[in-house]
Amino acid sequence: FDEAHRCVGDYAYVFVAKTYMQQAKDPLILALTASPGGQKYKINDVKDKLFVTNVEIRTRDDSDVKPYVHEVENDFITVELPIAMKSLMTYLVNIKNSRISKLMRMGVIRSNYVNKTQLLNLQVELAKKKQGVSYMAMSIIAEVIKIDHALMLLETQTIHALKQYTDKLSKEESRAVARLEKDDNFINAIRLTNELDAEGTEHPKLEKLVEIITKELQNKDARIIVFAQYRDTISKIYEALSEIKGAAPVEFIGQAKKKGKGLSQKEQSQILNEFQMGFYNILCASQVAEEGLDVVETNVVVFYEPTPSAVRKIQRAGRTARTQAGKVIVLMTKDTRDEAYHWSAHRKEKQMNQTLREMKEGKQITLKDFKNK
């Protein structure tokens, strides 16, 4: 079983493994994954579902692997937001902090530091109480979540993506948005976003990306994947890279969501074939390209933003250095969640390897023991 980390819930592997174990005379299962996850219970869950007994781990530095892997150059490039974008950030941070303070005064939260998952869980708990104060708190939490998303787009993505989001917000009919639209900080944030978008000012990452790709395309055989989290960002990346001499970018995204655009599996397959044949030399890709793709060779992988997930970090980086040396370039915005996400994924990957080594060194059944059972 390849990509064994997918073995959760009702994934087909579970049924196949169970049927095989029931019918095979001498069953023996090998499960492979580059990214099993960092938590022991998750790894054990995969083991149980695939009837796996022993765990083995190999990294690029292990002596029996080293002769067969190619060198990967890792570059981490940090950019700084310009003054106008920092001003915009200040407006958004002021809104978020004022709402967080309200929630603390209401006794709904006890700390200034709450993440999106905690806020969503809190909304669920408040909804169960069905009280006036609870409904008000839920609405304020909605404001925090919306503003934090806007902040994330400003810090890590593009002005274009932020403008698309604020335009969408303005069409929402909710109490949370109605209150935001009366806030001077929000009014100023929208004004500045519109001004920056109108004058063509973009996130410094985009300029740095154009610089990087221009340099990499000096290699006429270059094959490059640029990963980004959001489709609006991918569209802007495609637009910017299309201006580079010798660049032949293409958007590679998942299937359509509601009214949004998307690619069918047939279209995805066609784009990959054309990428391999050289019709395109840059994939501007979403998460759909992170695993399971039969890409012949990619010289360079660019993370437009770091991912906090160790699994996704490994999958993205795994798109290069398959048959020859490769390069992984990670773009980060200074003093933003980009840096936090980068170190989070690094820490999780380190923890994952440690967990696997501990599981490997624990009591395991040998092949001889297995046959004698």
What are these regions (language model features)?
Residues 28, 36, 317-348:
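Conserved segment of the helicase C-terminal RecA-like domain
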Residues 12, 16, 42-43, 52-66, ...:
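Helicase motor interdomain insertion/brace
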Residues 81, 331-373:
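Non-catalytic, charged low-complexity extensions flanking SF2 helicase motor domains
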Residues 223-227, 233-287:
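Conserved helicase ATPase core of P-loop NTP-dependent helicases/translocases
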Residues 254-258, 280-281, 287-323, 334-335:
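Conserved RecA-like helicase motor core of SF1/SF2 enzymes
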Residues 25-30, 222-223, 278-282, 327:
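Loop/turn-to-beta-strand initiation segments
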Residues 1-45, 302:
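SF2 helicase catalytic motif II
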Residues 24-28, 50-53, 72-74, 246-247, ...:
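Short glycine-/polar-rich loops that comprise or flank the Walker A/P-loop
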